[in-house]
Structure formats: structure tokens, C-alpha cells
Amino acid sequence: METENTLPKVLTVNEHPYTVLRLLGKGKGGYSYLVRDGDKEYVLKQIHHEPCSYYQFGDKLRSELRDYARLKALDIPMPALLEADIPRERILKEYIPGDTIDVLVSRGAMEPDYLRQVQAMCDCLYPAGLNIDYYPTNFVVREGRLFYIDYECNTYMEQWDFAHWGIQYWKQP
């Protein structure tokens, strides 16, 4: 895992440099950084090829791009995909500031409306034969609106849907 001392100072997307502000997180498929270009902030995701014992990947970057298109077609609220740098395996996304659901759960600040909003996403996803990664770090609330900030989606399987898997992580301890 990267630390503040090992963070790159600058990352480029299609030859355009972005100043790295901080590491936002590491997922199954990549590292996500908060980056800046002038006064505008973005998320830059760098695909990694570290092994994941519980998940099999093909081409991670192409999967992200395909999944983004599928979710966008269903109007799932998520950050806009701004650019893809295929040779460097990087994606530039809109940055959506706000608290993640895991932070809200830990603070005891979950609102019933957030569950209604994720259920509305499920109502779009399931008929299309899809699930998303319902883990609470993948959701940000901005001004009361819930956004899915990952692009991952998979073929629907009941054991991985929100009611059977995701909800357990959205509950107050």
C-alpha cells in the first residue's frame, strides 16, 4: 500500500499532468488518488495488477470502461468519466466530495433516505441483470444525494445483491 511518503507528486492522463493531493483508497482493481489541475479536483484511478484471491479479472481498464457505459445507460448516479489513458491504465473521473456511507455508519449518521436511494439503484440494476459493489466505501453522499463512486458491476446473483450482502455493511453497529 502506498503511504504519504511514497505517493507520486504528479500523474499524467493523456500527457496532461495532475498534481497528486492524497491517496483516496485502494480497491481490487486500482489506486484512487485525489488530484488537482489548477483549482479543479478530480479522481485519478491507476489500475494495478496485484493479486486478489477472491476475484478474477480480465482486462481491468476495459472492464471499467464497459461497466461505466452500462451503469450510465441505467442512470445510476455516479461521477462522470472524463478521460481514459489506455497505455498508462488510468481513468480520470469527476470528484464528488462528501462522506462515504461507511463514515456515516460509524458516526451514527445514516439516514433512511440513503437506503431508499440505494434501493432505487437496485430497482434499475436487477431488471438489467446487474449487481454493483454495495460495500459502503463505494458510496458518497453529497447534499443528500447518494452516488456510486465505483464503476464495477457484475452479473446479478442473489447472494451478492443488496438485500443479501450489501445491507449488512450499511447498518449501525
What is the role of each PLM region?
Residues 1-19:
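Juxta-kinase regulatory segment immediately upstream of eukaryotic protein kinase catalytic domains
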Residues 20-23, 28-62:
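ATP-binding glycine-rich loop module of kinase domains
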Residues 134-139:
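Hydrophobic residue at the +6 position relative to the catalytic HRD Asp in the kinase catalytic loop
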Residues 42, 77, 91, 147-150:
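Protein kinase-like catalytic core scaffold
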Residues 113-121:
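Conserved alphaE helix
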Residues 56-74:
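The N-lobe alphaC helix and its flanking beta3-alphaC-beta4 segment of protein kinase-like domains
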Residues 126-131, 142-173:
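C-lobe/activation-segment region of protein kinase-like
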Residues 57, 78-114:
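Conserved structural core of kinase catalytic domains
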